[in-house]
Amino acid sequence: MTAESGDQIPTVHVATSLPKRGVSSSVLIVPVVSTGDDEQSGERPGAVVASAEPFLSADAIAEIEAGLRALDATGASDQVHRLVVSSLPVSSVLTVGLGKPRYEWTPDAVRRAAGAAARALGTAKTVVTTLADLPGDGVCAAAIEGLILGSYRFSAFRSAKTAPKDAGLHKVTVLTTAKDARKHCAHGAAVATAVATARDLVNTPPSHLYPAELARRAKVLGESVGLEVQVLDEKALQKAGYGGLVGVGQGSSRPPRLVRLTHRGSRLAKNPRRAKKVALVGKGVTFDTGGISIKPAASMHYMTSDMGGAAAVIATVALAAQLELPIDVIATVPIAENMPSATAQRPGDVLTQYGGTTVEVLNTDAEGRLILADAIVRACEDNPDYLIETSTLTGAQTVALGARIPGVMGSDEFRDRVAAISQQVGENGWPMPLPDELKDDLKSTVADLANVSGQRFAGMLVAGVFLREFVADAVDWAHIDVAGPAYNTGSAWGYTPKGATGVPTRTMFAVLEDIAANG
C-alpha cells in the first residue's frame, strides 16, 4: 500500500545480532529507564539501559550509561540523548527514555518512545534498534509503528528552496530474539503505512484533492490491493436520490462523488457462511467553508482536514485487503466540497436523504451529517453485522474531550468495544452516551428532522443522535468523532506529527481484527 504524494516509507529488517558491517553510518536507538528517587531514597535520578543484551557487550552498555550520567539524563519518558560510543560500529547511539522500569511494557509506551526517537534522528537514513526486544506483548509491531510514524513527513508541495535536503529514514533494522518477530514487524509496518496513507490524503491541500481526485485516488489504491471499486458521479447520485450528498455539493464547481470499496474476505474464512460483514463509512468533505453559514476566516484553513474520516476508512479497508482479513468489509465514502455560491443550499432548504427521510437544513455548516446519512442508509442495505462510521463532525468534540481523545457513540455494547480497543492501540477513544431526549431538539416544523438543534449544549451528542436515525435497527454501530484528533494543530509529540495524524485508522483496523477473531 502506498500513497501517491507522500514521502518514502522505510523498509524493515529483523536481525538477532548487531551487524558488524554496513552500519557505520547507522544510528543505534536504545531504550533507557529511570533510576533513583529523590524524595524517597535521596538517590540522584539517572538512567540505565533497558534492553541491550545480548546485542551489546557489557563494555558498550557501560559506555552508554557513563555518557548518560555525564549528561544528567533521567530516563524520563520521551527524553532523548545522542552519544558517540567508541566500542560500537555505528555512527552514534540515540537513547530514548521510557520512564520508570516495568516488568512488561505496553505497546503504546514503546510506540511513543520509538516515535520520539524517530523525530530526533535528524538526517539519519538507517537505524538499528533494540526497542523491539523489550518485554511485553505487541512491542515488536509497536516499535516499528512508532519508528515509521515518528519519521513521517510530507513534503510533496515544497519547492527546492524548502524541501528537505536528505531523503529521510530509509531502513530500520530491529534487533530481537522474539519468536515470530518478522511476522509481527511486517504487521506493524503494514499498519503504519496505512496510517501514513491516511495522513498523506489529509495533508494534500484542497486545491489538489477535490471530490473527483479523492475518488480517483481511492480507486487506484483499492484496485492495487484487489478491492472491488464503484464510483458514483453527480449524475448517478442525483438519479439514485442521494439528496444529502447532492445538496451539500451543489454549491461547488467540483461536484460530489460516492466511492464504494469492497473486500470479500469471507472467502478466506474457515467457515465463510459464519464470517461477519462490517460496513465502514467516512466523511469526505474535501474542504468545508461552512457554505452559506460560513465559518470564521481565522481557522478555516484547517478544514483541509475535513475528509479525515474518509481518508482513514479508505486506508483501513485497503489494509484489510492487504492483510487478508477473513471478513467482508465494505466502505462507503461520501465526498463533497462545501462552498458558498449562487447554487449552494440555503438555511431553510429541505433535502430528501437517500432512503426518503426529509431534513430541514437550518445550518449549512452542519453538512457532514447530511452526506453521512446518505452513506449510512446505503451501507445498511448491505445488511452488515456491524457499522463503523468516523468523521471530523463537530467542534463540540474538542470542547468535551480535547484535541487528542475521539468521542465514540453508538450501540452501547459495540460502542464500548470500539472505545476499549481504541484505548488499547493508543488512540484513546472515549465512550459517550446518546440520550434519547436530544432527539426532541431535532424536530422540524416542515420536515422529518432538522440538521441541528436550537441548543448550545451537547453538540457532539446531538450529531450522534441525528446519525442514529439513519442506522438500520438490526445493525450494531459506532460513530467515532475525530474533529480534534484527526489533525494536530499543535507541536509534534510521540509518534504524532504536526498536521494529519491518521486517527482513527489503527482503531478501526484493530476492531476489524477483533471481529475477525471473535465475531
Swiss-Prot record:
Keywords: Aminopeptidase, Cytoplasm, Hydrolase, Manganese, Metal-binding, Protease
Main location: cytoplasm
GO cellular component: cytoplasm
Organism of derivation: Mycobacterium marinum (strain ATCC BAA-535 / M)
Protein name, entry field: Probable cytosol aminopeptidase
Cofactors that this protein relies on: Mn(2+)
Residue ranges of the TM segments: none
The protein's Enzyme Commission number: 3.4.11.1, 3.4.11.10
Gene3D superfamilies: Leucine Aminopeptidase, subunit E, domain 1, Zn peptidases
